[in-house]
Amino acid sequence: METLLEKIKKVNEILKDDELFKEIHIAKGENEKFIAEMNNGYKTNEEKLEYLEKITGKSINKSVTVSLPFQTDFGKHISFGKNIFVNKEAIFVDLGGITIEDDVLIGPKVSLLTVNHILEPSKRRGLATGEIIIKKNAWIGAGSTVLAGVTIGENSVVAANSTVTKNVPDNVIVAGTPAKIIKKL
C-alpha cells in the first residue's frame, strides 16, 4: 500500500477538496497528541527520542539530541541520521519530506518548511510540497528558514537569520534573504 508521502510526491498540487488533503489533516491531528506530550515538562534525551520515534514512526539513533520545545506538523516524513543536534524552538513542517543526514547542527528557531500554498488565488487554500535534504555535516544557523524543495550541501553553513530558497552546494557559507554564497570552505 502506498504511503502518504508517496502519494504526495506524485502530485504537484493538493487542493483543499481533494481526498488527499483530508487524509493529510487526519494524520496531522494524530501527531498533535505526541507533540503536546513531548513538549510538556522536563524530558531526558532518552524520553525525547522515544517520543520522536512515535512521531516519525522510525527508529532514532541514540546520538541524536533534540532540545524542547520542538514542533512538527506531521512527523512521519522526517528522517534523522546519526549525531544530529536540533536546538530549541525548531519547526519542521515535514509533509513534503525532511531528510537530515549525519553530523548536522540545527540552531534555535530554525524553520524547515516543505509546504507552500499555491499562488493562484482560486487554489490558494491548496498545498504544494517539496522535500528538504540537509546533507552530512551541514550547519543551519539560528533563526534561519529553509523552504520547500531545497538541498543544503555537505559541510555547508547557513548563516543565522537567512532564508534559503534555492539549493546550496557543498562546502560553502550562505547568508541573507534570499541566501547567497558569501564564502567557499
Where are each of the predicted segments found?
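Short linear capping/connector segments at secondary-structure termini
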Residues: 49, 68-69
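Active-site/ligand-binding-proximal alpha/beta "capping" segment
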Residues: 165-166
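Terminal amphipathic alpha-helical/low-complexity segments used for targeting or macromolecular assembly
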Residues: 1-63, 179-182
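Flexible, glycine/small-residue-enriched loop-and-beta-strand segment within the central core
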Residues: 70-80, 85-152, 177-185
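Short-chain dehydrogenase/reductase
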Residues: 65, 105, 139, 157, ...
